[in-house]
């Protein structure tokens, strides 16, 4: 890496803009980082003016993080290659569907010794079947290492400066330290673990479970039912990682990227909110995205589809009844009210055992 580490944030939505507040402040304050941070912004017109111009003049992303000032050293750039070409650290924070195309644009245009970190919660379909982790796609296309950052980090709360934790999954301790320095703040505490794949899988799968929690809220089934969906969702997350990414540590699920992120998303995230409206309004997911998300995309339904694609290929749908039911509800093969029937006889309820009597 260069003596002064250059940073580029690829993405400027709600989460990208929130993380820019932390990254920009740290780049300005810490001597190892170049003060100027570039942020790739997909150009849009807002009231007749370019979004990049608004951000650079007012230091506010009025489209995706209204009311929050960005550090003045964060510079909005509408050209992806121009934003990224000098970066030593590339922070990817865009909807996962865009990553393959972005990587094609960046191939051969970035520093060969750069590193990446993905804040993207989702999977992509692999060619020939299965699922691809976003960090793997980035590494494969750009030939650079890619860490991941996942956690119970609702963007607006991070932007407000409310205390939270996050998890960085990084297999190289040397890179883990510089990434921790870049993201750590008084209100944003970072734990680095080496179990990167499990960290990333948690970040994607919890969005599926959050859709189930939203269906429960829409049906007004109460907190007990919602708690059951969250617990069964966690068990399916653990089982999924065990089947498809063996060797991961159970302890990873008890970091911020696991159970904490799952709880937060099932009570406060956009996947829960839109899924509740899906039940109560009778509108499609696509219609609700346009109405409720201000141009942003929902991650839960496409992730559920990609996971179902994998499970179906392996003949494992019946082993993951919650994931399967949520996917089928999202594509209107099942009604939301069918969710509970689908999980009533969950494998977790069948594996019963009798506890030995305690010795008195």
Swiss-Prot record:
Catalytically driven reaction(s): sn-glycerol 3-phosphate + NAD(+) = dihydroxyacetone phosphate + NADH + H(+)
Compartments (UniProt record): Cytoplasm
Entry keywords, A to Z: Cytoplasm, NAD, Oxidoreductase
Keyword Cytoplasm among record annotations: yes
Listed GO CC annotations: cytosol
Pathway per the UniProt entry: Phospholipid metabolism; alpha-glycerophosphate cycle
EC number: 1.1.1.8
Active site: 206
A single GO molecular function term of this UniProt record: glycerol-3-phosphate dehydrogenase (NAD+) activity
Subunit (UniProt): Homodimer.
Family: Belongs to the NAD-dependent glycerol-3-phosphate dehydrogenase family.
Protein name: Glycerol-3-phosphate dehydrogenase [NAD(+)], cytoplasmic
């Amino acid at each position: 890496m260069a003596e002064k580490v250059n940073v580029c944030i690829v993405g400027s939505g709600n989460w990208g803009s929130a993380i820019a507040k932390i990254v920009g402040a740290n780049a300005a304050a810490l001597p190892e980082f170049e003060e100027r941070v570039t942020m790739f912004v997909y150009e849009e017109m807002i009231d007749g003016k370019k979004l990049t111009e608004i951000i650079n003049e007012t230091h506010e992303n009025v489209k995706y993080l209204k009311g929050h000032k960005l550090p003045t050293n964060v510079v909005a750039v509408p050209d992806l290659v121009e934003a990224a070409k000098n970066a030593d650290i590339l922070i990817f924070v865009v909807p996962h569907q865009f990553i393959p195309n972005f990587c094609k644009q960046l191939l051969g245009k970035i520093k060969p010794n750069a590193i990446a970190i993905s804040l993207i919660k989702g999977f992509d379909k692999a060619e020939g079947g299965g699922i691809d982790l976003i960090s793997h796609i980035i590494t494969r296309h750009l030939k650079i290492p890619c860490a991941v950052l996942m956690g119970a980090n609702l963007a607006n709360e991070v932007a407000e400066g409310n205390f939270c934790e996050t998890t960085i999954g990084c297999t190289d301790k040397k890179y883990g330290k510089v990434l921790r320095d870049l993201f750590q703040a008084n209100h944003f505490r970072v734990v680095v673990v080496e179990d990167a794949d499990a960290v990333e899988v948690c970040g994607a799968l919890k969005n599926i479970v959050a859709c189930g929690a939203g269906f429960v809220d829409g049906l007004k089934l109460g907190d007990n039912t919602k708690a059951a969906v969250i617990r069964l969702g966690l068990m399916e997350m653990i089982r999924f990682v065990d089947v498809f990414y063996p060797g991961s540590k159970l302890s990873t699920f008890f970091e911020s990227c696991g159970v904490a992120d799952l709880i937060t998303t099932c009570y406060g995230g956009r996947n829960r909110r839109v899924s509740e409206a899906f039940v109560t309004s009778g509108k499609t997911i696509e219609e609700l995205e346009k109405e409720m998300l201000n141009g942003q995309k929902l991650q839960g339904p496409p992730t559920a589809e990609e996971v179902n694609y994998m499970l179906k290929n392996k003949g494992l749908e019946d082993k993951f009844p919650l994931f399967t039911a949520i996917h089928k509800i999202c594509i209107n093969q099942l009604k939301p009210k069918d969710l509970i029937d689908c999980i009533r006889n969950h494998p977790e309820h069948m594996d019963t055992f009798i506890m030995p009597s305690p010795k008195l």
